[in-house]
Amino acid sequence: MTATASSPLESTDASRAGARASVRYTLTLGMAAASGFIALSYEIVWYRAFAFVSWGHPTVFGLLLAFYLLGVALGAAGSRPFCKPRGDAPSEADDARALRALAGFVFLANVVGFVVVPALGRFATTNWLPAFGLVALSAGLMGAVLPLVAHFGIAPDDRAGARLSYVYLANIIGSSSGSFLTGFVLMDAWSTREIGTFLALVGFAMVAVLAFLAARKKPLVLGLSLAFVAASAAGSVAAAPKLFDKLYERLLWKTKYHEDAKLVHVVENRHGVIAVNDYNQVYGGGAYDGAFNVSLVDDKNVVERAFAVAAMHPSPKRVLMIGLSSGSWAQIISNLPGVESVTIIEINPGYMELIRKYDAVKSLLSNPKVQIVVDDGRRWLLRHGSERFDFISMNTSYNWRAHSTNLLSREFMDLARGH
């Protein structure tokens, strides 16, 4: 019996191939996580803009998700020509080609994703529905990334299934991180423009890493590639103020928008967007939400309804209000004769930020009879089942808006009636 021993050269080649495969797979996990983070973060930003332009119409989320998933499916299918057989041990040239394809898809997806919201603003002045096409395009380009990433980093051996599961796990972790960080942290700290610019820079950083790995042994190509990515990143930062200029004016007034239109205040946080025009009218999530006014003389917000509380109850000592908005109703009710305490439940603290700016209502925040609680109305009622009030006021929004049944359902009315 004879045995063939491998030569030192063959052992070295196998060792190098194994090390390259390990690095390739580690890079694959990182790219899967990063692409998930960017994709889900962009989707959250897009939904904010689409919800605002539609006044929170309940069909918008479904349409946005449908176009997003359609794009992902088409992008995944379209990546097939780039997923050619690479053999058990792909060469460095094979890796470079795969990385260049990945860099191209991520670059284009990032650029389109960045301009979706500004483009929606421009579309809104005529017809904003075509903007869904940009959502599908960006999602399609990003949807091609995961198949390409898997093809690049997973060797076709008996562990391919296990490795693919970890790639999916990395993508899910990145997506979840994007949902949490963007939805709960960044939206409480930054504006839509700042978040969009940040995501664009993250995307360009991902492209830069891919470009570096694809051309690291070609100094001239590497220099040109990185210079192009850097110029694109700088261009996005420089263009952002112009692209996002008067975004919410366009989304709010749509076909009635004109260049002189101006919102005097815009508050953005993780709960939504509140805008105020120069007539002191408030728009929450794009829909009319009252005005800063307590006068019956110039009753632009029909505050006679708040004064009518005195006619509906002979002596309302304890009053509960679900919703604060401009604070005009709360200001009137808290100063009615006989009212001893007013408890106000408001889910969006941004309204208090605006109330401080208007003389007609700002004293509400320092009124000792008034307690403002930042919470969900249903949750507060459930947690305070023993509380009782003489009068409950709810000046709710349009019944057809998304989530309006949280306040208008029979179940909620029964819950409120118990207090």
Positions of predicted regions on the chain:
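Alpha-helical transmembrane segments of multi-pass membrane proteins
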Residues: 1-419
